[in-house]
Each structure stands twice: as C-alpha cells, then as structure tokens.
Amino acid sequence: IKKPIDFIMQKELGIEPQFLFAPLIYGAILTDRNKVGPSTIKESMKTVKKGKILGVFPEGGITSPVLTEAKPGAVFLASKTKAKILPVSVRGASNAWDNIQRGIRSRIYINIGKPYGPIKLDGTRQEKTQKINAASRELMCRIAALLPEDKHGCFSNDPSISMYQIENDLESA
C-alpha cells in the first residue's frame, strides 16, 4: 500500500505513549467507537477525497485474539464515502511491543485481500440497517478468509469464508 493511511482510532483510550508517533506518520481521526459522530464522517470523507486510505478496525478496536462482530461504522463509512473496502488481517502484533522491549523480534503477519465494493445502502431505515448488518458480516468473513481457522471466532462456521479464500487464491490462511 503506497498511499498515506489515516486511521480511525477510539478517543476514549487515547494514544498509548509508545504509539504517539503513529498519528504523525499515518494520521488519526479520533472517534467514539460506540457512536460515529458527524465530525468523524466529515473527517473520513475529507481523507478519502484527498486520495488517502482510511484505515478502520471494523470491530471497534483490537481487543480479542479471535474475530468478533463488526460495529456498523466501517460499512457505513465505506458507503458514505463510496470507497472500496480492502480487507486486511494482522496477526502476531498483540505482543510485539512487549517483545521489542525485551529484545525479542516478533513475527507479524499481514494478509491483504482483494478490494470489493463500494457498498450501496438504500431503502427504508430498516432495510439500510439490514444491509449494514449483512455487509458487516461479509467484511468480517472476508477478513476471516485471510486468517488461520482458529482465529475466525464467531464466524467459524460461515461457508462464505472458503469462497473468499478461493477469491484471494488461498486454500486456507
């Protein structure tokens, strides 16, 4: 990925001291992960209009070693900005900082799937909600396809994962 990335980060946690450099290098849009506000949407749209990549953690942060349900914000923002979604999985980063401090080099695996979208949300409010939920599930299954099976979490038995693995030229991650 050769373009600048601005990440949406949860403001309630702030930025941990060891990551203070990240917003300077990448850019950060601070948001409430439970409720996407108008300023987040405006900043996200500005980022995309500038030709930058908007990095979003669909689960609302990194809190579990396995995949969990996505919050609606990632799909909503992708729809609002008319942007394609690039599924990315990161594995092995949870202990990386601790390992670096102890002089141990961590292995971090990043898999990048094929882009898809944009997502179109139209219809009644109820229909839009259903489409957001379905698109959020699709996003998480596309990410699951890039991870080993033991990391699929609540998506473990979803048959679409194998279809996305084939789409990404993976037998299984």
Put a short name on every predicted segment.
Residues 1-36, 43:
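Catalytic core of membrane glycerolipid acyltransferases/transacylases, capturing the structured
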Residues 39-173:
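Non-catalytic C-terminal accessory region of glycerolipid acyltransferases
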